[in-house]
């Protein structure tokens, strides 16, 4: 694919810079002045790779990359988190796919070249759910269910911490490749960003607007609100006479995120995070030939697409995430109780297509040989509920410092598959006769595929 225009990076840097200068926060300015007068080195706090509360990056025993969002904006010049980290973190990789039957609608991410379901993603130190999509049909990360990194707006993020080492013993088997912790902002003040980009070939136009505002909840807490709208245009690098479209998918994202905390009695603090995103995306499947090709009548109808056609796999994705918890001090012990909810749903709508068996039956019955050109192909959903109770204490006089931590976790998960409409999966002209059954581009889920499965785990 061609390189991005230099206009993209220049516009992004200037917009992020001007947004930061325009942010109004008297409290933040006062903190900056006070911090500048303080002697001593500034330490960055890391929450991955250690159960110790407020450990610095130099205290951890494992390699942790702490990537501030200011660096991402200046060096990456991207509009979404997955592609931004691709240019910043050496161990992180996210590859946009094409013609992958739904996997190209979600940019799954991974560490160290391992599967996307072997990288654990946290938000403010709490487990984030994976997508409902299982990557199949020859896609990258085949058989994996990754985490949708692009469901979180960039402007809501303070920094990203990447643990570039296996952490299965501490976090579970889904952390074999490493851990990514996304820390959200709670700073006071408001800022806004607008961006535009395109490829040098003139396609793949991207429009992004995002706004952040952090407000004080009296003198006891803060509430941060972030909204983002991202419109990514389709690109195509196939030959002019090709029956394929090879390039970025078309996507429209609408995202809202809340993050904050509120001090309770004593040393306790209530914290909360909530976010929701709706995404309408569209990718191109493999093309079908027209008159004179072997695709008629098996995969096409001369009456509908005499010159051939490219089916489009359209997906509507709903993603929801919420965490509420309470941290306090019980004697010398740090206590943290939390409840996390995650939900991801994806519905397929196949357009610019046909069911060749329906078209062939229509032709056999004296009709023109047509079928419907769009189908509801069904979909799937995934829900996860996680309850945690964590306790830790640091003994600074034992063996030059020793941290003791223990806790419990209960997790409940539910997975569903929904059937599509009959035309998306039926074969009406007889098996092995004439046109192939099912919608071209992506076959719909049948009633026999319908699933509602649950599982529970305690640790």
Please report, for each region that a protein language model flagged, where it lies by residue:
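Outer-membrane beta-barrel transmembrane domain signature of Gram-negative proteins
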Residues: 301, 309-322, 341, 353-459
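Extracytoplasmic beta-strand/coil segments of soluble accessory domains associated
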Residues: 53, 83-131
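Outer-membrane beta-barrel and related beta-rich outer-membrane complex signature
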Residues: 133-135, 232-241, 271-298, 338-357, ...
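Residues that define the transmembrane beta-barrel architecture of outer-membrane proteins
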Residues: 174-176, 197, 203-209, 250-254, ...
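Transmembrane beta-barrel wall of Gram-negative outer-membrane proteins
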Residues: 191, 201-307, 311-331
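A beta-strand signature from Gram-negative outer-membrane beta-barrel systems
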Residues: 128, 143-193
């Amino acid at each position: 694919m061609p390189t991005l225009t230099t206009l993209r990076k220049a516009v992004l840097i200037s917009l992020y810079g001007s947004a930061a200068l325009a942010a109004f926060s008297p409290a933040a300015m006062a903190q900056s002045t006070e911090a500048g007068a303080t002697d001593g080195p500034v330490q960055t706090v890391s929450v991955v790779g250690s159960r110790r509360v407020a450990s610095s990056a130099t205290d951890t025993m494992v390699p942790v990359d702490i990537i501030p969002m200011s660096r991402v904006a200046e060096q990456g010049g991207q509009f979404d988190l997955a592609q931004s980290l691709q240019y910043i973190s050496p161990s992180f990789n996210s590859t946009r796919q094409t013609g992958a039957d739904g996997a190209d609608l979600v940019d799954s991410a991974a560490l160290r070249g391992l599967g996307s379901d072997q990288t654990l993603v946290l938000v403010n130190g709490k487990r984030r759910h994976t997508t409902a999509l299982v990557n199949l049909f020859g896609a990258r990360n085949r058989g994996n269910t990754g985490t949708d990194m692009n469901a979180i707006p960039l402007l809501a993020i303070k920094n990203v911490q990447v643990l570039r080492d296996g952490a299965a013993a501490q976090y579970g088997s889904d952390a074999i490749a490493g851990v990514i912790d996304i820390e959200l902002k709670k700073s006071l003040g408001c800022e806004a960003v607008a961006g535009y980009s395109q490829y040098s070939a003139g396609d793949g136009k991207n429009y992004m607007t995002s706004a952040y505002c952090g407000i004080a909840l009296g003198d006891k807490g803060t509430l941060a609100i972030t909204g983002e709208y991202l419109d990514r245009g389709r690109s195509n690098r196939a030959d002019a006479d090709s029956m394929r479209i090879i390039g970025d998918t078309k996507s429209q994202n609408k995202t809202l995120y809340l993050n904050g905390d509120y001090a309770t009695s004593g040393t306790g603090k209530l914290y909360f995070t909530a976010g929701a995103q709706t995404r309408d995306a569209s990718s191109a499947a493999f093309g079908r030939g027209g008159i004179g090709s072997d695709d008629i009548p098996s995969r096409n109808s001369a009456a509908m697409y005499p010159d051939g056609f490219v089916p489009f796999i359209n997906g509507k994705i709903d993603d929801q995430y919420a965490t509420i918890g309470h941290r306090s001090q019980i004697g010398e012990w740090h206590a943290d109780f939390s409840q996390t909810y995650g939900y991801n749903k994806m519905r397929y709508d196949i357009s610019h297509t046909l069911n060749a068996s329906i078209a062939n039956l229509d032709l056999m019955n004296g009709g023109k040989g047509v079928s419907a050109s769009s189908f509801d192909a069904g979909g799937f959903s995934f829900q996860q509920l996680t309850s945690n109770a964590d306790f830790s204490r640091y003994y600074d006089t034992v063996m030059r410092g020793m941290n003791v931590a223990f806790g419990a976790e209960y997790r409940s998960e539910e997975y569903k598959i929904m059937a599509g409409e009959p035309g998306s999966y039926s074969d009406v002209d007889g098996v092995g006769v004439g046109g192939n059954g099912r919608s071209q581009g992506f076959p719909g889920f049948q009633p026999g595929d319908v699933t509602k499965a649950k599982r529970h785990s305690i640790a």
